Amino acid sequence: MTFIRKPAGQAKPQKYSTDAYGRPAGKFRRNGPIRKKVCRFCADKVEIDYKNLSLLHTFVTEKGKILSGRMTGTCAKHQRELDTAIKRARMIALLPFTVN
């Protein structure tokens, strides 16, 4: 009876994929697993209004750029409404286009 041996250099499959530094890639961060961002407009039933400047300022960078939905966690529907509200507020000079 003959036994077939595995080659010595064959590695075991890992449970999680790792990056170049041996850390888990994409599944974990330093304090635990990555949480999915929840759309605050869907969760709290908040209406998006172009006159609500305190709300709109949280979705604009200090340079005046609109933050993406990936950064803020908003869903696609509310991101579109947010974009139009910010653009309306800019057109009637409630928000600046750029910061000097």
From Swiss-Prot:
Family stated for the protein in its record: Belongs to the bacterial ribosomal protein bS18 family.
PROSITE patterns with a match to the protein in the record: RIBOSOMAL_S18
Cellular component aspect of the GO annotation: cytosolic small ribosomal subunit
Record's protein name: Small ribosomal subunit protein bS18
Biological role: Binds as a heterodimer with protein bS6 to the central domain of the 16S rRNA, where it helps stabilize the platform of the 30S subunit.
GO molecular function: small ribosomal subunit rRNA binding; structural constituent of ribosome
Coiled coil stretches, renumbered: none
InterPro entries, per database record: Ribosomal_bS18, Ribosomal_bS18_CS, Ribosomal_bS18_sf
Species this protein is from: Endomicrobium trichonymphae
Disulfides per UniProt: none
Any GO BP annotation: translation
Assembly with partners or alone: Part of the 30S ribosomal subunit. Forms a tight heterodimer with protein bS6.
Pfam families with a match to the protein in the record: Ribosomal_S18
Region (Disordered): 1-23
Alphabetically ordered keywords of this record: Ribonucleoprotein, Ribosomal protein, RNA-binding, rRNA-binding
